[in-house]
């Protein structure tokens, strides 16, 4: 068996051991709507002496009409740097943030990605709205420069603040999950690698 495992590692490469905190308890819910709600949840875990290593901040931490700009809503999350510092220093907890390859039409990052031709066009051309009522699209993650731009966006706006982990959400990509599969593929066609029929959910 050791030979099989070592042979597999030869093919895949050596996997680094995750940090100890990543193996502990993670608290997650549909979302925390504001900074004080998230900090209060962690505080309550500590008061009750329930072990907690990571808390997940799911979607809609951004302004409601700015999906894809990767900014915290300044009303609901007035001090994200302070929030993350409190999690780290006062509560010895880590923060995971969900990020999506999705952009609302007209946002700053949408315009930047669109100007390079890195966004799928069909959903915008059809004026198809998401479940919150906005027209959006996804970037082509098969395109290497687009991936670099996406990383630069989330690194500058989020990781640099001290975010510890990413939840890379909707990477299927899930523009409209209730549509027939042929239309879902058409929404992301073509990719930088070729037809969506071949690379959908790759």
Predicted regions and their residues:
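Catalytic-domain carbohydrate-binding cleft regions of carbohydrate-active enzymes
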Residues: 1-202
